[in-house]
A protein has these predicted regions:
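Short cysteine-rich loop/turn motifs with clustered Cys
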Residues: 2-48, 71
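Substrate-binding/catalytic groove segments of enzymes
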Residues: 17-19, 57, 78-82
């Protein structure tokens, strides 16, 4: 688990979207919406987790430089894949949609 300081730093790195409150709404690396208060909520289409860009199984560490916010289904789909991986959720306007598994 990550402490609040790390969670906040990772959130701050997520993509801001014009005309949306960046304190509440951002997008992950796959283009899926995430909501700040939905951290760790796998029962939400807007839930997110902290992803290790360079997977721990390949020697990636917990330094913030190697961490990013990722919609939870995209994080599951990515798993230990690096550098290429597949997304399962992307945005369509202001909502998230299931896309199968698209190459990112």
């Amino acid at each position: 688990m990550f402490d609040d300081n790390t969670i906040n730093k990772v959130w701050d790195k997520a993509t801001k979207v014009d005309k949306f409150d960046s304190a509440q709404f951002r997008k992950d690396a796959c283009g899926a919406w995430i909501i700040r208060s939905h951290y760790g909520q796998r029962d939400s289409i807007y839930g997110w987790e902290i992803d290790h860009v360079y997977p721990q199984s390949m020697g990636g560490g917990d330094d913030v430089v190697n961490l990013r916010a990722m919609q939870w289904e995209n994080n599951l789909s990515k798993g230990d894949d690096y550098p290429d991986y597949k997304a399962t959720v992307q945005s369509d306007g202001n909502k998230n949609v299931q896309i199968g598994r698209a190459h990112v």
